[in-house]
Curated annotation (Swiss-Prot):
Residues 212-243 form a coiled coil. It comes from the Eukaryota. Keywords: Cell projection, Cilium, Coiled coil, Cytoplasm, Cytoskeleton, Leucine-rich repeat, Repeat. The keyword Cytoplasm applies. Residues 173-211 form the LRRCT domain. Disruption phenotype: Absence of outer row dynein and a reduced flagellar beat. Axonemal outer row dynein assembly is prevented by blocking association of heavy chains and intermediate chains in the cytoplasm. It comes from Chlamydomonas reinhardtii (Chlamydomonas smithii). InterPro entries: Cilia_flagella_integrity (IPR050576), Leu-rich_rpt (IPR001611), LRR_dom_sf (IPR032675). The lineage of its organism: Eukaryota, Viridiplantae, Chlorophyta, core chlorophytes, Chlorophyceae. This is Leucine-rich repeat-containing protein ODA7. Belongs to the DNAAF1 family. One of its GO terms (biological process) is axonemal dynein complex assembly. LRR repeats lie at residues 47-68, 69-90, 91-112, 113-134, 138-159.
Length: 432
């Protein structure tokens, strides 16, 4: 729903964002996502430096009052189809007009101090739609990503911006239409320090310039030259550090009253034998030489000594055979060998289990379990009372005192029956 930008609405915006009620005291104003359809009633905000109008329904920038101090204007995500009305803000430094309906960039020459222009996700297609950029002489950062630019001639327009440093063109067909896109842009715009997704370093610029002048051969020569220069710098740094260390040792020897020298004084007390290392066994040297005669296994790391030995054979002109380290078929992997050993161990275990007889409880064990009271301990009895196991029992004939004998007989009978059942079970199993 559209809303009007009135003084009352602007005052409410100031309240919501903790700004001053007095308009002239504010140097920024957040009017984003308010549904405003036009710019109005900003005359009292004469000291604004940043104005946020993102996410409204503006169709034009007309209505901006003279704001001499305004540096940043954010009007992305609106419905603007034409740039106009910027004459009132000649000191504008940054303009974000992305995600609008622009088909042409214009009306920017009235902002001679404009250094950053962000115009992504619009409808810029032809060279004419961006030709006006040649008049923005102070422009340093230009973002035209995700438009519809496809003519390689845009490079000629960008060349006319003398101080262009950051350029973003990803998301446009022109990136694919320009052969050797990055090299062309780097050599065409000498001031460029950042292109799309990464910086432009000095070495890249030198390589691109060599490619422009000498093609691929010139590029290779420049890469080799840069590599040699880097190695030379590293060598000089190493020599300088060694000289500093030797000078420090000489100074230390002088303070300690030791003879002159370039070595660490702490090593003077060590004998020459402490620096000697045991020689490698002849068997190890011979094995390494044999292995070095074969190429490395694909996908496996090999010891550094083996790689060095193979390089030595190559330098001596000796042949290096293709294939595995050993003779014959390629050796099995460690995982396959381990799996086979596990299967063999499992098979042996299964055979042993089949040969072992079944272990069943004996009758004596069952009798002992029946004699053992519940819980492994006899229940505590009160003084003067008869234990439950020895309490008198009345037989069918009326006699007393024979209950314990009856219980014992019952246990033995149960045990005998259990033993007979176990024997029968064993016989049946033997038949199986």
């Amino acid at each position: 729903m559209c809303a009007c930008m009135t003084k009352e609405a602007l005052l409410e915006v100031c309240k919501q964002n903790g700004l001053y009620r007095t308009a002239s005291l504010n140097d920024k104003l957040y009017c984003n996502f308010k549904g405003f359809s036009q710019i109005a009633c900003l005359e009292d905000y004469v000291n604004l430096k940043a104005l946020f109008l993102e996410g409204n329904v503006l169709e034009t920038l007309e209505g901006l009052p003279p704001l001499a101090d305004l540096k940043c204007l954010y009007v992305q995500q609106n419905c603007i189809w034409k740039i106009s009305g910027l004459e009132a803000v000649p000191g504008l430094d940054t303009l974000n007009i992305s995600n609008n309906q622009l088909t042409k960039l214009e009306g920017l020459a009235c902002c001679p101090a404009l250094r950053t222009l962000i115009a992504t996700h619009n409808h810029l297609v032809t060279l004419d739609s961006v030709a006006h950029l040649a008049e923005c002489k102070a422009l340093q950062t230009l973002d035209l990503q995700n438009n519809e630019l496809e003519d390689p001639g845009i490079v000629d327009i960008l060349k006319q911006i003398p101080d262009l440093r950051c350029l973003y063109l990803k998301g446009n067909p022109v990136v694919s239409n320009i052969k050797n896109y990055r090299k062309v842009l780097v050599t065409s715009i000498p001031s460029l320090t950042y292109l799309d997704d990464r910086p432009v370093f000095d070495n890249e610029r030198k390589i691109a310039q060599a490619w422009l002048e000498g093609g691929l051969e010139g590029e290779r020569a420049m890469r080799n030259q840069l590599k040699e220069e880097e190695e030379e710098r590293s060598r000089k740094n190493h020599e300088f550090m060694m000289q500093m260390r030797a000078a420090g040792w000489r100074e230390r020897r002088k303070r300690m009253g030791l003879p002159d020298g370039d070595t660490d004084p702490a090593l003077d007390d060590m004998s020459d034998g402490e620096y000697e290392f045991d020689e490698e066994p002849e068997e190890l040297v011979e094995a390494r030489q044999r292995l070095a005669a074969y190429t490395a296994r694909p996908g496996e790391e090999e010891p550094a000594e083996l790689a060095s030995a193979r390089q030595g054979l190559a330098r001596d002109g000796k042949p290096i055979q293709e294939g595995a380290w050993g003779s014959g078929a390629a050796a099995e992997s460690d995982s396959a060998i381990y799996l086979q050993s596990v299967k063999a161990a499992q098979a042996e275990l299964d055979v042993v289990r089949q040969q072992q007889p079944r272990q069943l409880p004996t009758a004596q064990v069952l009798i002992e379990e029946l004699d053992e009271p519940c819980g492994g301990k006899a229940p505590a009895a009160d003084e003067g009372s008869t234990p439950p196991a020895l309490s008198p029992m009345t037989s069918p004939s009326g006699s007393e005192g024979q209950g314990g004998e009856g219980v014992a007989a019952a246990k033995k009978g149960a045990a005998s029956g259990a033993a007979e059942g176990i024997s029968a079970a064993v016989d049946i199993n033997d038949l199986d």
